[in-house]
From Swiss-Prot:
SUPFAM superfamilies per record: alpha-D-mannose-specific plant lectins
InterPro entries: Bulb-type_lectin_dom (IPR001480), Bulb-type_lectin_dom_sf (IPR036426)
Name this polypeptide is given: Mannose-specific lectin 1
Keywords, alphabetical: Disulfide bond, Hemagglutinin, Lectin, Mannose-binding, Repeat, Secreted, Signal
Subunit structure: Forms heterotetramer of 2 chains 1 and 2 chains 2 arranged as a dimer of chain 1 and chain 2 heterodimers.
Domain Bulb-type lectin: 29-134, 148-255
Leader sequence residues: 1-26
Biological process per Gene Ontology, one example term: response to other organism
Role noted for this protein: Mannose-specific lectin. Shows agglutinating activity towards erythrocytes from rabbit.
Gene Ontology annotations for the cellular component aspect, listed alphabetically: extracellular region
């Protein structure tokens, strides 16, 4: 059982990948990447929160008190996340029914159903761990049921806590080594035995950091960006990617909320 707790100390965060094409997202996942499409009656789910592209063309976040207010404005509608970070609902004839309005630099974005009941668009990735690249002998588990695959800014993994996606696991091991199991080669931080009671955290500048019980930095991804909210996604293809900062999110108090556009910020 993953030990995923809210980290109550000051945080800072980051992950970077070139844009790429993605096939239609599978129903039941909790994120949508640039180029992916949520088909009619498709769902993105996280706990009690369910984002549905309804057959009446309305995009609704159930239990999150938000909708696109596009009911009966089209047929066979689909939701797409563009490579400029904009969510777009298109009619079956290809015409645009609704757009989020948040656009930024071209890149690889992620729209995530947040566990607090918001749909959040995170800007281009700033760091990735790809187990298809040589570096560690392949380490494979048996078929592992899908559980938690997200780590947000301010959260930590510790004591064999893990993120899982299909047959892949990212584990913050008790020996202080961060290991991504699965893929052709797997991946590790090579920090075995370098500390005690180590934990992994994602800060608010998009940086992954392993610290020991004295809060000494054992390892970091060494990529950081502007201050904001980031997310580490262990994707179904086994690649762990940090996206952020957030540029748009739904809000129950308003139809939509814009968060600052992505620029090259100073560290």
């Amino acid at each position: 059982m993953a030990k995923l707790l809210l980290f109550l100390l000051p945080a800072i965060l980051g992950l970077l990948v070139p844009p790429r094409s993605w096939s239609a997202v599978a129903l039941g996942t909790n994120y949508l990447l640039s180029g992916q499409t949520l088909e009619t009656e498709g769902h993105l789910k996280n706990g009690d929160f369910d984002l549905v592209m309804q057959d009446d063309c309305n995009l609704v976040l159930y239990n999150g008190n938000w909708q696109s207010n596009t009911a009966n404005k089209g047929r066979d509608c689909k939701l797409t996340l563009t490579d400029h970070g904009e969510l777009v609902i298109n009619n079956g004839d290809g015409s645009t029914v609704w757009r989020s309005g948040a656009q930024s630099v071209k890149g690889d974005y992620a729209a995530v159903v947040h566990p607090e009941g918001r749909l959040v668009v995170f800007s281009p990735s700033v760091f990735k761990i790809d187990p298809s690249v040589p570096g560690l002998n392949s380490l494979r588990f048996r078929n592992i049921p899908f559980t938690n695959n997200l780590l947000f800014s301010g959260q930590v993994l510790y004591g064999d806590g893990r993120l899982t996606a299909k047959n892949h696991q990212l584990v913050m091991q008790g020996d202080c080594n961060l290991v991504l199991y699965g893929g052709k080669y797997g991946w590790q931080s090579n920090t075995h035995g370098n500390g005690e009671h180590c934990f992994l955290r994602l800060n608010h500048k998009g940086e992954l950091i392993i610290e020991d019980d004295d809060f000494k930095t054992i390892w970091s991804s060494s990529y950081s960006s502007k201050q904001g909210d980031y997310v580490l996604i262990l994707r179904d293809d086994g690649v762990a990617v940090i996206y952020g900062p957030a540029i748009w999110e739904t809000s129950p108090q308003a139809k939509e909320k814009m968060i600052g556009m992505v620029t090259a910020g100073k560290l």
